Amino acid sequence: MSKKKPQQSSNTIARNKKARHEYFLEDKFEAGVSLQGWEIKSIRAGKVNISDSYVIIKNGEAYLLGAEIQPLNQASSHVYCEPDRSRKLLLKRRELDKLIGASEREGYSIVATTIYWKGPWAKLEIFLAQGKKSHDKRDTIKERDWQRQKARIMKHSVR
């Protein structure tokens, strides 16, 4: 009898679900994140929150703000752990130039949506996003409810 294969766990560490509701997501980018050792250990333990995070461009470099990485209890006492510090994003120059040009337009911002593992590295999925108005959010909710109703009707009509 062969051994059972270990289940493949998801590579996703944290997700910003609020971003899909608050913004029209347009262009997707994958960025590396410059992290310290204690941050990687905390991310492996799942102590990360990116729900209110966003990206700013400063001096031609991209930084992640608003992401919280809580230090582990057994973290070293001689290292100061700052949970909400700004973290540099590692992007190619062409991607960075595209983000700089697009984010300067009125109504556009750069939002972090997912942090995940790609091999041994933590990667961040960021989107160029345009803010939704409240009526757009209501339209999205109505459309989602209608899709659920349609699925329910089709399910019962087949019987």
Curated annotation (Swiss-Prot):
Its main location: cytoplasm. Keywords: Cytoplasm, RNA-binding. One of its GO terms (cellular component) is cytosol. GO terms for molecular function: RNA binding. InterPro entries: SmpB, SsrA-bd_prot, SsrA-bd_prot_CS. It is found in: Cytoplasm. Belongs to the SmpB family. This is SsrA-binding protein.
